[in-house]
Every structure is written in C-alpha cells, then in structure tokens.
C-alpha cells in the first residue's frame, strides 16, 4: 500500500485586468452581446489613465458572435477615425476576429467584406494594433452592450455615441 501524497498549496492566478496603453496611444475595446435574433456591438475608448474618451454602440440584426464582433471592430475603428486619433490599440475578445484583422487567417465569406473594410481602416491610422484580450479584461465593452440592449434600439446599424452625461455611469467599470 502506498502512502498518500502530500497536497501542495496552489498559487492563485493573478487577476485579469484591463491594462493601460502607453501615453500617446488610445485603447479602443470592442465587444458584442448576442440575443435571440439580434445583437449589440460596442466600442469603448480610453486614454493611458483609463479615462473613457468615447463610447459608442449599435444594434445589429444578427446574433452571430463572429459577425457581431467583426462589426464591433469595424465600429471601433470608425470611432477612432471620427475622433482623429493617430495611434490605437484595438482590443477585442474574439480571437478569430483579431487573427483576421492581423492577416493571420482568412475570414469566412459571411464577414469577409467587413474584415476587408476594417483592415483598410486600420491602415488609416499612424499606427494601429489589433490585440486579443481576455473577456475578463473586456468587461467595460460588454457592460455597454448589456446597457444598450435594455434601450430597445432599432436594427438600423447606426452607431450612437453615448452622451457624456452617461459616461460617468460607467466610470467604475472603466477601472476594471
């Protein structure tokens, strides 16, 4: 009979949190939240201190997460261009979409035009880096999606900027 092996203590994993970008780079996180027959895409832009600079959201007539995340990335890039930011980190938790934007994989046909347009937009910045982020570090973008889902928006693919008076409601989420 063998003797029992001692149980070694485990080291807890460090918490996954949003990381600040360098001072001259704006970080734009994109997210998607699907419902039964539609979804909400969001883009949250923050500076090097984590302060929200702009938040936008859009209801889309698709619950497909791949399509929703591709459209969210496109909306995040359009937000960055509209604000005339020269350098951005484009962060999302869809690894597939990030790979498509980086040129590491070919996008499936149902989103290829959105990916193509997004890659063209990426080239409009002085520098732009599509980066995958763990969903736990993308909570702010997902919180905006859930908030917008409650607003009963129209399915017209119109991106709306969150009024600055409401941005403060999400200030706590920006600390994550």
Segments (PLM) and residue ranges:
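Primary recognition of RNase H-like, Mg2+-dependent phosphodiesterase/nuclease domains
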Residues: 1-176
